[in-house]
Amino acid sequence: MEALVYTFLLIGTLMVIFFAVFFRETPRILRK
């Protein structure tokens, strides 16, 4: 069960960082 929790937290952190960098580096898509 611990493996699933750690995996979930890891994926969640990676997704947050990915979206943060994505929205910072590509504001053109938001201004579509």
Curated annotation (Swiss-Prot):
Compartment(s): Plastid, Chloroplast thylakoid membrane
Membrane topology, from the record: Single-pass membrane protein
Ranges that cross the membrane: 3-23
Cystine crosslinks: none
A GO-annotated cellular component: chloroplast thylakoid membrane
GO biological process: photosynthesis
Alphabetized InterPro entries for the sequence: PSII_PsbT, PSII_PsbT_sf
Keyword terms of this UniProt record: Chloroplast, Membrane, Photosynthesis, Photosystem II, Plastid, Thylakoid, Transmembrane, Transmembrane helix
Pfam families: PsbT
Subunit structure, interactors included: PSII is composed of 1 copy each of membrane proteins PsbA, PsbB, PsbC, PsbD, PsbE, PsbF, PsbH, PsbI, PsbJ, PsbK, PsbL, PsbM, PsbT, PsbX, PsbY, PsbZ, Psb30/Ycf12, at least 3 peripheral proteins of the oxygen-evolving complex and a large number of cofactors. It forms dimeric complexes.
Function according to Swiss-Prot or TrEMBL: Found at the monomer-monomer interface of the photosystem II (PS II) dimer, plays a role in assembly and dimerization of PSII. PSII is a light-driven water plastoquinone oxidoreductase, using light energy to abstract electrons from H(2)O, generating a proton gradient subsequently used for ATP formation.
Family: Belongs to the PsbT family.
Protein name: Photosystem II reaction center protein T
Protein species of origin: Trieres chinensis
Lineage, highest ranks first: Eukaryota, Sar, Stramenopiles, Ochrophyta, Bacillariophyta
